[in-house]
């Protein structure tokens, strides 16, 4: 299996250095590599070439987003990454041709024009929120929503181009817990 890891952590000096996200990406690379999988990684903060990233998405069977969650979403550099990579994939018609709808077939639904069927997308995220804040109807902030509900703005991009979105993985309460292992 070919796996592409997109490490979207953004460093905030003296507050959020990315140690945990980088360690998680390294652990994933080592674990998958030891089992014979071909693994590539892009550290978005360091730089990326949209055309290279389109090729990596085409080549990968699974794309893993490793990210911190800041203010209930991925860091802004990830939005830039998606804009540049997916627009390059649309322009070249490699990731998708269109949004799926056609005038000749009104039954075609919005979000069905992608070419990435048979591929998976997985989010591994670090959260300051405690795990019991999710799927909890008594939680005032999230009101019973799951982690995946809150990550819909991220996963929908991949579903739009045809990926199967897998259930996410999270490490929670990272500032409130001294041991996140």
Q: PLM ranges: what are they?
A:
Residues 1-4, 20-21, 26, 140-181:
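Glycine-rich phosphate/pyrophosphate-binding loop and the adjoining helix
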Residues 1-35:
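N-terminal beta1-alpha1 ligand-phosphate binding loop
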Residues 8, 44-46, 69:
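Active-site loop/turn elements of alpha/beta-hydrolase fold enzymes
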Residues 31-37, 113, 119, 157-166:
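A structural motif corresponding to the C-terminal end of an alpha-helix
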Residues 35-48, 169-172:
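A short beta-strand-loop structural module common to alpha/beta enzyme folds
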Residues 47-55, 177-181:
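Structural motif
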Residues 51-154:
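Helix-loop-strand module that forms the ligand-binding subsite of alpha/beta enzymes
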